[in-house]
Amino acid sequence: QLWPRPQIPP
């Protein structure tokens, strides 16, 4: 199952 990866700010 795929889950949304946490958005890491640049």
From Swiss-Prot:
Residues with the modification Pyrrolidone carboxylic acid, per the entry, are 1
Expression by tissue: Expressed by the venom gland.
Q: Which GO terms describe its biological process?
A: regulation of blood pressure
Q: Give the CC-aspect GO terms.
A: extracellular region
Which key words tag this protein in UniProt?
Hypotensive agent, Metalloenzyme inhibitor, Metalloprotease inhibitor, Protease inhibitor, Pyrrolidone carboxylic acid, Secreted
Q: Which GO terms describe its molecular function?
A: peptidase inhibitor activity
> Into which family does the record put it?
Belongs to the bradykinin-potentiating peptide family.
Localization recorded for this chain is: Secreted
Q: Chief localization class?
A: secreted
Its biological purpose is as follows:
This peptide acts as a hypotensive peptides, but its action is not related to angiotensin-converting enzyme (ACE) inhibition.
Where does this protein come from, organism-wise? Crotalus atrox (Western diamondback rattlesnake)
This chain belongs to the protein called: Bradykinin-potentiating peptide POL-236
